[in-house]
From Swiss-Prot:
Gene coding for it: rplT
Domain of life, per lineage: Bacteria
Keyword Hydrolase: no
GO biological process, one term: ribosomal large subunit assembly
Keyword Oxidoreductase: no
GO CC entries: ribonucleoprotein complex; ribosome
Listed InterPro entries: Ribosomal_bL20, RIBOSOMAL_L20_CS, Ribosomal_protein_bL20_C
A UniProt-annotated Pfam family: Ribosomal_L20
Gene3D superfamilies per record: 6.10.160.10, Ribosomal protein L20
Single GO term (MF): rRNA binding
Protein name in UniProt: Large ribosomal subunit protein bL20
PANTHER family found in the cross-reference section: 39S RIBOSOMAL PROTEIN L20 (PTHR10986)
Family designation: Belongs to the bacterial ribosomal protein bL20 family.
Matches recorded under HAMAP family: Ribosomal_bL20
Length: 115
């Protein structure tokens, strides 16, 4: 009886990896061994950066709010403290958009906090 070498599964596995590395540069897209290593590293970066993206956006929103507050003479920390005391429930993303797109509404919120 002939030995079954499982050829179709072997080819399918390699094909699946090489399909995922289609846009990679050099031998990383065509050499299975390098493609497999690069794909694993890419997946690690993707997993890490899904977490980092959240941090980066929060930092961006805070810096935008701080920049908008520099005209009003209120610091960011006092502003957030005032939001909590005034029981205004607006998150940093919305505040950042207000500071950029609707300056008058943002200034009204700052005036409300100063009371």
């Amino acid at each position: 009886m002939a030995r079954a070498k499982n050829g179709t599964v072997h080819v399918a596995r390699r094909k699946r990896i090489l399909k995922k590395t289609k846009g990679f540069w050099g031998t990383k897209k065509s050499n299975y061994k390098k493609a497999k290593d690069t794909l694993x590293k890419g997946m690690m970066y993707a997993t890490r950066d899904r977490k980092v993206r959240k941090r980066d956006f929060r930092r961006l929103w805070i810096s935008r709010i701080s920049a908008a507050l520099s005209d009003t003479g209120v610091t960011y920390s006092r502003f957030i403290e005032g939001l909590l005391k005034s029981n205004i429930k607006i998150n940093r993303k919305i505040l950042s958009n207000l500071a950029i797109e609707d300056v008058e509404a943002f200034k009204k919120i700052v005036l409300e906090i100063r009371r």
